[in-house]
Amino acid sequence: MMSNENFDNDYNLPPPNDSAEDLKIFIKRYERSVDSTLLEIDENKREALEKYIEERDRKMKYEIECNERLQGWKKLAIEREISEEQSGEVQFPRWIDEWANTKLGGIFERIFSKMDSMQNDMNSRFDAMQNEMNSRFDAVQNEMTSMKGEMAEMKVEMVEMKRETIRLNTRIDLLEQKTEARFQSIEQRFNSIDQRFNSIDRRFDSMEQRLDSMDQKMETIDARSCRSIMLTRKLENTTRSDQGYLASPVPFLNGNEPANSGLPPIERVEDIDELSKEQCVQYLKGYGIMFSPAETIKLKKRLRDAVGLWSKASTEYEFHQFH
C-alpha cells in the first residue's frame, strides 16, 4: 500500500494500485492545486489590469500637456499677427525688394504685350461668332414661321377633339346613370337574399337549441338507464349470492363494463379480497361510491355492497389488508 503523503505521478493520473483512501486524498490535493493555480491566474490578471490603467492615465496626461502647449503657441502667434497689423510695421524680406526692382518691370511689359495680342484675337473671334449667330437666327426665324402655321392647324384639330370629348363625356354620363340604376337593383336583390339567409339562420339556431335540449334529455335518459341497469344487476347478484351462484358483472354508472377498463371480474367475495387498493378505488369511482382515501378494509366492504354480495357468507367474510 502506498503512503498517503506522496504521489509519484505529480497529480496527472492516480496510480492504478492505490487504495480508495489514497485516491480520495489524491483528489482533495488535486482540487487544492487547481484552486491555487486559478488564484494565481486571477492575481496576474489584476496586476496586468492595474498596469494598463496606469499607462492609460500617463498617456492621457501627456496628451493634455501637449494640447495646452499647442494652444498657447497658437494664441501667441495670433496675438503677434494682430499686433503687427495694428502697428503697420510689417517688414517684408529684403530679397522681395531686390526682385521687384530688377525683374518685375520686364515681366509686366511681357504681360501687357501678351494681353494686347489676346484682345485682338478675341475681337476677331467675336466678329466671326456674331456672323454665325446672325445666320442661325435667320434660319430659326424661318422655322418659327412654319411652326406657327402648323400650330394654327393643330388648334383647329384641338377644337374638334374637344367637341368629340364632350360627346364622349355625355355618353359616359348616360352609361354611369344606367350602371348606377343596375347596381341599386342588384343591391336590393342582395338585401332580400340576406334577409332570407337571416331567416334561415334563425331557424337553424332554433333547431340547434332543440337538438341541444334533446341531447340533454337523452343524456339524462342514458344516465337513468345505466343506473337502472346497475341496480338491476346488483339485485340480481343479491339473489344469486343467496342461492350460491357466482355474481354477474355490474356495469359502471357511465354504462362501461369493468372488463373494458382492464379490471379483473368480481364473481365472489374472495375476488374483492384479491384486488389491489388502486383497483378497488377504480371500482368504487365507477359506481359513484363515496369513500375516504385513508380507508383500507372498509373500501372492500363498500365494494362488496356495491356489487350486491349480500349473502350471509359474504357479509361474514373477513377481508385482509391490501398487499
From Swiss-Prot:
InterPro entries: Mug135-like_C. Pfam families: Mug135_C (PF08593). The keyword Ligase does not apply. It comes from the Eukaryota. Keywords: Coiled coil. Residues 27-63, 131-225 form a coiled coil. Belongs to the UPF0612 family. This is UPF0612 protein C569.01c.
